[in-house]
């Protein structure tokens, strides 16, 4: 992404610089109270500002990113080992679903990443009509799976959106967060899906 934006706008951008700014960008996004698109804007503007983009050129960056997003969903990068971790969870008898603030393309993105078959249910906010942290979207996933809040566990990477939203629906939540990042007090956390599987699968690794 950095290389394509840089080439299109004549800016010197490196992926490493964007990665280094990701924790601060995530904190900026957490502070936004509003629609998910507003959180995304805060995240990207912080990310590119920290990577050295002058404030007067952020508008060009937003326009460029919007075009790239139409080509390929920018929020669907898959971490190494994701499928293996999901398969461990499923093999242990856990039923999996997705609740996503998105633009109607989550199902297609999961198929492109060869992950759709890992999930019984996918609830996309653009199709459902409400976004996290609204508890209604979490309840829709529960209803589709046929489980109660007490039988479910939600894992997400944003405290305000995922953890508080799940709790409002009566669901226990785990925050997916790098080990180096700070988390609010009293929040259960894991650093990766692999670590989650280690916690939830009886006997650990096979």
Can you say where each PLM-predicted feature lies in the sequence?
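N-terminal helical cap/lid subdomain that shapes the substrate entry/recognition surface
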Residues: 1-84, 91-92
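Asp-based, Mg2+/Mn2+-dependent phosphohydrolase catalytic module
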Residues: 7, 12-16, 49, 56-62, ...
């Amino acid at each position: 992404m950095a290389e394509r934006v840089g080439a299109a706008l004549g800016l010197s951008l490196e992926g490493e610089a964007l990665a280094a700014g990701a924790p601060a960008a995530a904190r900026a996004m957490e502070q936004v109270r509003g629609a998910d698109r507003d959180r995304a804007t805060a995240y990207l503007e912080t990310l590119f500002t920290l990577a050295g983009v002058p404030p007067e050129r952020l508008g060009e960056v937003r326009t460029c990113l919007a075009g790239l997003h139409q080509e390929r969903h920018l929020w669907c990068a898959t971490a190494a080992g994701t499928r293996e971790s999901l398969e461990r969870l499923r093999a242990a008898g856990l039923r999996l679903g997705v609740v996503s603030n998105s633009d109607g393309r989550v199902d297609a993105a999961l198929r492109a990443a060869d992950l759709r078959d890992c999930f019984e249910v996918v609830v996309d906010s653009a199709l459902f009509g409400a976004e996290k942290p609204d508890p209604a979207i979490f309840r829709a996933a529960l209803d589709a799976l046929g489980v109660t809040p007490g039988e479910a566990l939600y894992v997400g990477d944003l405290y305000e959106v995922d953890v508080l939203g799940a709790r409002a629906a009566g669901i226990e939540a785990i925050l997916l967060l790098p080990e180096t990042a700070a988390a609010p007090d009293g929040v259960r956390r894991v650093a990766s899906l692999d670590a989650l599987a280690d916690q939830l699968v009886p006997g650990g690794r096979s």
